[in-house]
């Protein structure tokens, strides 16, 4: 089923970047900004709050713009926000990250809900159960791959001391930029959707 294949692939591709953020940002705040684990945890807390808030808007957004346009534009926004996490220098206030994380949580929620629902939209009744299981497994794999990918990129930049000018914080900044760009590029996967895809869900 085409929508299932594209949904699974898009889910995996976009989560590579998205899943790296909850690890990289607290790590950067602790290492580069010399803050406690508690402080770094509170910095990313708004992501969960806005994610819950976004749930009430997902259906309205999908009904108005459709799945294809929503996922492509939303992925671009998420990637741009991840890139923005690399803007502040080491002398900036850590509270600069709060509005970015809050907005990111909102769009993440839209992304996850849209990807999960379109993935099983065209499955037949006897395929729905196994389809849901595969979507769930794919999510777990994507989270693991995303964390690993983020750490690999960070390690690469940390080993390039001339590139980061012997400043660990610059390694994090370049990592966020790389992860953000990857996320933006992953949005092209959703071009394989048709404008009419998900119409059966939108009418409900």
Name each model feature, range by range.
Residues 162-164, 196-204:
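Short, Lys/Arg-enriched, Gly/Pro-containing loop segments at transmembrane-helix junctions
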């Amino acid at each position: 089923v085409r929508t299932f294949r594209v949904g699974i692939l898009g889910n995996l591709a976009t989560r590579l970047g998205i899943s790296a953020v909850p690890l990289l940002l607290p790590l950067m705040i602790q290492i580069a900004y010399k803050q406690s684990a508690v402080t770094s945890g509170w910095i990313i807390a708004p992501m969960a709050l806005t994610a819950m808030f976004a749930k009430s808007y997902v259906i309205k957004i999908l009904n108005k713009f459709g799945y294809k346009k929503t996922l492509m534009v939303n992925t671009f926004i998420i990637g741009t926000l991840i890139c923005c996490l690399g803007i502040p220098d080491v002398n900036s206030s850590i509270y600069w990250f709060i509005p970015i994380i809050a907005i990111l949580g909102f769009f993440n929620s839209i992304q996850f809900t849209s990807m999960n629902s379109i993935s099983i939209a065209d499955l037949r009744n006897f395929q729905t159960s196994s389809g849901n299981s595969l979507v769930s497994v794919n999510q777990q794999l994507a989270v693991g791959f995303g964390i690993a990918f983020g750490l690999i990129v960070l390690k690469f930049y940390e080993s390039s001391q001339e590139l980061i000018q012997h400043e660990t914080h610059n390694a994090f900044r370049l990592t966020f930029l790389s992860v953000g760009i990857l996320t933006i590029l992953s949005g092209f996967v959703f071009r394989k959707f048709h404008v009419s895809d998900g119409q059966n869900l939108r009418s409900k």
